[in-house]
């Protein structure tokens, strides 16, 4: 089985241009492809993870990845799939985020002489002259076609700014530049990027008279069609300081039964034959598959030691309902107490079990918070310092998410 057929079997491919040519190219290890990452935060997320694993799979098959850091396009903001305009970041923020991305990518992709390369589109986009850009590529874009593009659909309903409207042109120009200066002949991206990617292949065809290729990755959604990679409204980060290895493990351990095999196929490097065996499991036996999924992904992102710790902690907590040394914990300080007490709402927000005080109130009202073995029923519930003595107090959200508070 070639790498193209494996990507198909794993359910990773959504749309492609020139399928037979792409199949032949990637199976022969002759593709030089790029995937772009806009620097909207100081860490990559679980949402980026599938793109990183795709780059790794294709590199292992002999193809050369180009990791494009969007230092320039981030200054505009990608409107794809958005109902609001993205927050404008400063150049300093974008440069800092780009450095964070580079460090994280190096854990997945093999960079170096003759291997993967990393580029930043700020190096060419920030120096563009507007008049020269219009003269060079403006005639290659149809406004009518751009307005019909799916990537602008939701923003058109709320009001698409001219700033965002230029994003497709900038992304297309990236492909044009990479094709000319780096020999990059293929672009990969999320399925919501299809229109932008076609803009790039068309620009190359019209300006250079040559073929370039595009292929989109299936978006990682759950059985209800919602994008995966968030918990309690917060992103699941690859940075261990933003999402602990234990919380990362727990996110994947708690996926719905209907999603576990799909996640194995799309995100792990487990052999398809092994995944097929897990697919035979039903009922409570599916927990074995979930544990395997969580372990594999935690090992990929955080290493074997952290995966082992997370597995041990999760088993201890679920089996005994007790305290594990590797359970996520917060040491409370004097600043957290008012008149010697701390509120249940503050505990939920401090532990990130709830993304906001409003969400914390809703969680308590819906009976979703336990402190020790007792359900917290009052939104004004408080705890005195004595509650956190010794091994501390374990707070539980729902059935599966734990956090320990100590002094």
What are these regions (language model features)?
Residues 1-33:
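Positively charged, low-complexity intrinsically disordered leader regions
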Residues 204-407:
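Conserved nucleotide- and phosphate/pyrophosphate-binding catalytic cores
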Residues 51-58, 178, 196-204, 297, ...:
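Buried hydrophobic packing segments
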Residues 21-79, 187-194:
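N-terminal catalytic cores of NTP/NDP-binding nucleotidyl/phosphoryl-transfer enzymes
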Residues 79-95:
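A charged helix-plus-loop insertion that forms the helical arch/lid used to bind
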Residues 77-81, 128-134, 226-232:
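Short acidic, glycine/serine/threonine-rich loops at helix termini
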Residues 10, 90-91, 97-218, 222:
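Divalent-metal (Mg2+/Mn2+/Ca2+)-assisted nucleotide/phosphate chemistry catalytic cores
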């Amino acid at each position: 089985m070639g790498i193209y057929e494996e990507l198909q079997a794993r359910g990773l491919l959504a749309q492609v241009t020139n399928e037979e040519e792409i199949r032949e190219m990637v199976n022969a290890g002759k593709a030089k492809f790029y995937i772009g990452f806009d620097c909207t935060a100081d860490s990559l997320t679980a949402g980026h993870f599938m793109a990183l694993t795709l780059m790794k799979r294709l590199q292992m098959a002999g193809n050369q990845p180009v990791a494009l850091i969007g230092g320039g396009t981030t200054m505009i903001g990608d409107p794809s799939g958005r109902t609001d305009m993205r927050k404008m970041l400063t150049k300093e923020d974008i440069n800092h985020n780009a450095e964070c991305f580079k460090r994280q990518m190096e854990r997945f992709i093999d960079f170096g002489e003759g291997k993967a390369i990393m580029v930043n589109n700020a190096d060419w986009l920030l120096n563009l002259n507007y008049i020269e850009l219009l003269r060079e590529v403006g005639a290659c874009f149809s406004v009518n076609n751009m307005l019909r593009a799916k990537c602008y659909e939701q923003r058109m309903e709320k009001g698409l700014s001219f700033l965002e409207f230029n994003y497709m042109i900038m992304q297309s120009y990236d492909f044009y530049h990479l094709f000319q200066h780096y020999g990059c002949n293929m672009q990969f991206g999320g399925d919501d990027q299809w229109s932008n990617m076609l803009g790039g292949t068309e620009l190359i065809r019209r300006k250079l008279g040559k073929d370039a290729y595009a292929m989109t990755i299936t978006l990682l959604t759950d059985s209800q069609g919602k994008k995966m990679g968030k918990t309690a409204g917060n992103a699941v980060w690859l940075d261990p300081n933003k999402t602990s290895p234990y919380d990362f493990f727990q996110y994947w351990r708690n996926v719905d039964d209907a999603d576990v095999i799909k996640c194995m196929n799309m995100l792990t490097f487990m052999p398809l034959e092994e995944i097929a065996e897990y697919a035979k499991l039903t009922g409570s036996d599916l927990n074995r598959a979930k544990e395997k999924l969580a372990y594999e992904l935690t090992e990929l992102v955080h290493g074997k030691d952290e995966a082992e710790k997370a597995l041990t902690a999760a088993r201890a907590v679920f089996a005994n309902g007790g305290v594990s040394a590797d359970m996520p914990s917060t040491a409370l300080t004097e600043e957290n107490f008012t008149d010697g007490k701390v509120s249940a709402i503050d505990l939920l927000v401090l532990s990130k079990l709830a993304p906001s005080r409003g969400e914390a109130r809703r969680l308590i009202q819906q009976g979703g918070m336990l402190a020790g073995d007792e359900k917290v029923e009052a939104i004004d519930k408080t705890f005195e310092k004595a509650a956190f003595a010794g091994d501390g107090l374990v707070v539980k959200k729902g059935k599966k998410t734990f956090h320990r508070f100590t002094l």
